[in-house]
């Protein structure tokens, strides 16, 4: 058995040193490393990569040597040259600065809004999203329904959990990468209004 390490969003770490990958510390050759350029360059590039431990490399070549990549050779060679010339690292540095500024702006706007006193920011040091724990007794489904009635679409952490638990309730997932910051204050006010009306009867349990 092997561990599949999907190092998604690892390039965007804003606090502290990069965390070593499991693959880099694996001495038993049981970790397969996966990553993609879709977030760091563009989703349309559709180029990902996989690092295999030596003991699996020959098996891969034997069993899957016939596999044909769907990405054109031209795009692969262009990306390879981009990396070889050091342009990728320069690009990544610019993107990290841009997203750090965007993240800081979103956190600041949340703190300045009426929602601020009922929201606790979590997991904001890496990736292009963070979590916000809301102070509310509303079930997540009811919170989402009431928000939808005000034109808001909320992504809750419990939506991604196959076994929802109380410890993961009331946690909002905020993806700020493509967020329109000019509309955020109004959205935060609408969400604050939803929490203001918490005492209204729930439509579901």
For the regions a language model picked out, list residue spans one by one.
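Catalytic PLP-binding core of fold-type I/II PLP enzymes
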Residues: 1-15
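Conserved PLP-binding active-site segment of the aspartate aminotransferase-like
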Residues: 52, 131-137, 154-194
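Active-site C-terminal subdomain of aminotransferase-like
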Residues: 56-75
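Structural signature of PLP-dependent enzymes
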Residues: 61-64, 85-107
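Conserved glycine-rich beta-strand-loop-beta hairpin in the small C-terminal domain of fold type I
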Residues: 80, 97-107, 119-133, 143-146
């Amino acid at each position: 058995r092997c561990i599949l390490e999907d190092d998604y969003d690892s390039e965007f770490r804003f606090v502290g040193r990069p965390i070593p990958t499991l693959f880099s510390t694996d001495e038993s050759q049981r970790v397969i490393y996966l990553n993609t350029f879709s977030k760091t360059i563009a989703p349309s590039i559709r180029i990902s990569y996989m690092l295999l431990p030596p003991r699996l490399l020959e098996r891969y070549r034997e069993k899957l040597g016939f596999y044909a990549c769907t990405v054109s050779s031209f795009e692969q060679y262009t990306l390879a040259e981009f990396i070889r010339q050091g342009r990728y690292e320069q690009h990544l540095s610019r993107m990290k600065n841009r997203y750090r500024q965007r993240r800081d702006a979103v956190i600041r706007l949340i703190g300045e809004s009426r929602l601020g006193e009922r929201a606790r920011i979590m997991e904001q040091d890496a990736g292009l999203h963070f979590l916000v724990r809301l102070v509310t007794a509303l079930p997540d489904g009811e919170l989402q329904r009431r928000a939808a009635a005000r034109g808001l679409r909320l992504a809750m952490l419990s939506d991604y959990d196959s076994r929802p638990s109380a410890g993961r309730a009331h946690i909002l997932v905020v993806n700020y990468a493509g967020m329109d910051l000019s509309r955020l204050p109004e959205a935060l006010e609408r969400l604050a209004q939803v929490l203001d009306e918490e005492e209204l009867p729930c439509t579901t349990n």
